[in-house]
Amino acid sequence: MLFIDFCKILDKIEKTTKRLEKTDYFVELIDFIKTNGKPENLKQVSQITIGRVFAEFENKEIGIGPNLLLEAVKTTGISEKDLKSKIKETGDIGIAVENLSSNIKQVSLFSQALTLEEVYSTLKKLSEIEGNSSQKKKTRIISNLLILATPVESRYISRLILEDMRIGMNIPTILASFSNYFNINKETVEKIYAVTNDIGLLGEKLISGSNIENDSELQLKVFRPIKPMLAQLTPSIEAAIIETKMPQFETKYDGARVQVHKSDGNVKIYSRRLENITNSVPELVEEIKKIDIDNIILEGECVAMDLSSGKPRPFQDILRRFRRKYDIDKMAEKIALRIYFFDVLYYEKGLIDTPLKDRREILEKLFGTNNWDTELSKIEKEIFSNKMLFSSFKLNSDDPILAKEFFNWSLSIGHEGIMIKNPDAPYTPGSRVKTMYKVKPTLENLDVVVTRAKIGMGKRKDWYGSYEISVKDYEDNLHVIGNVGTGLTEDDLEKLTKIVNEIKIEDLGEEVILEPKIVLEVTYEEIQTSEKYEMGYALRFPRVVQIREDKSINDINTLDDVKKIYEIERNRK
């Protein structure tokens, strides 16, 4: 399949803002591949359309930043001055390269047109290049691609290299296209994607005529992590009890979500971003290997513990453990970790359609019961132990007074609050569900993505000191909700400035526009209505709590979350 044929449809998708039209254009693309291409072409275009050449669970990226791309573009014959001027004018490196493509040194007029397969495989290879001369090799490969490309191809190659296609397409739109073209129930397609995290594989299977509901490659598998199920906000414990009937309450731990996979004695541990963190936590791996059970996927919260106080250490200590590559054993001696497991997603077979109460029963056979109302003395003793693996502390009750006591106790041992779960509910990967709620004592912190950065003043003049922050809507469009600079230490500012310089895509002088890759957790005095921002809301006195290196743009809060918090707080006043 020629890459230019793909780019023509990408151009149509980019030019419309209507989601239904984008869906129709992708259906047109599927039909073109069905007639003129191969099954693997749908795998390739499904990934490329959302700015990827790897499946999400593979934990790989092309790994090229804007600066290296600029260097590669310069070697094609485009001057740095013209390139920077055009980027400033258009705000888009892809459009800039396309507009300046007449300056690119062309190879023979008889050179073959680029194929989709060639572009896809070439960009996958970029991630594998390492060593002292890796930058030169990557620059040469990118340059060669651009020299062979037509103007519109150069636009999309440049954007794909940065993994930001800027065409307004996302996973739900592609899934809707699959559903329409192959005449399959949308919920079925969404569910199968949720257990594979591989839009390309799903597309290839569909166009090959697979019975996707019974295809073994499209089932939940050990060592292929899935996105976590997410909780809703609730205005009160009483409201959540009404929604969940006889709920299961659990402590909401001050830690990091992890997924543990075990099969044939092998253990892998994944973060909420599906990163493989196994090598960073060897003591946990050894403990899990001792469990007399196999072929299982567990979910829990990893907590850094201060064993002298029985309370969790700061969240940054967990990240220090997860990011550590050297002297891991020494770090393990300084920062003790434990996991509180709260779910079993797979045991010999997928369990996500099984009610929570039955999944919990399996969990308790492995790690004990930890019922707060009947085993409190045992729980409080074990909090100070060297034990590493626990089942989460829980309470089954519909009594709001007892639930509030459990909530206050969870806060007293240093954790964030409680979770309220429907015991009859299945597990829905990657979705924010109405069968699980979270209760915290203060305003819910927000996870936001940085979209711009501005040079600081005074003591901060050597760093980017102020950051524009945004949330997303259901179509993954970003909406500015404020600017933040307070709460950041000098170490934070130095770290952020380094990252900003790697991911800036447009320089406006004292301010730069960024790829949306930095996630911050922020607190604030309140959410208020505002005409300043298009979304209609703004954070009053936002303050950075921490840099969330464990989260990506996929994990940030939504416009709906902001509206819900605003309504909850307004009703409390």
Curated annotation (Swiss-Prot):
Active site: 252 (n6-amp-lysine intermediate)
GO MF annotations in UniProt: ATP binding; DNA binding; DNA ligase (ATP) activity; metal ion binding
GO biological process: cell division; DNA biosynthetic process; DNA recombination; DNA repair; lagging strand elongation
Pfam families tied to this protein: DNA_ligase_A_C (PF04679), DNA_ligase_A_M (PF01068), DNA_ligase_A_N (PF04675)
Catalyzed reactions: ATP + (deoxyribonucleotide)n-3'-hydroxyl + 5'-phospho-(deoxyribonucleotide)m = (deoxyribonucleotide)n+m + AMP + diphosphate
Cofactor(s) it depends on: Mg(2+)
Keyword Cell wall biogenesis/degradation tagged: no
Cysteine disulfide links: none
Magnesium listed as a keyword: yes
Gene3D superfamilies: DNA ligase, ATP-dependent, N-terminal domain, DNA ligase/mRNA capping enzyme, Nucleic acid-binding proteins
PROSITE patterns per record: DNA_LIGASE_A1, DNA_LIGASE_A2, DNA_LIGASE_A3
Annotated binding of ATP, by residue: 250, 257, 272, 301, 342, 432, 438
EC number: 6.5.1.1
Sorted UniProt keywords: ATP-binding, Cell cycle, Cell division, DNA damage, DNA recombination, DNA repair, DNA replication, Ligase, Magnesium, Metal-binding, Nucleotide-binding
Stored NCBIfam families: dnl1 (TIGR00574)
Known role: DNA ligase that seals nicks in double-stranded DNA during DNA replication, DNA recombination and DNA repair.
Family per record: Belongs to the ATP-dependent DNA ligase family.
Protein's name according to its UniProt entry: DNA ligase
Natural source organism: Methanococcus maripaludis (strain C7 / ATCC BAA-1331)
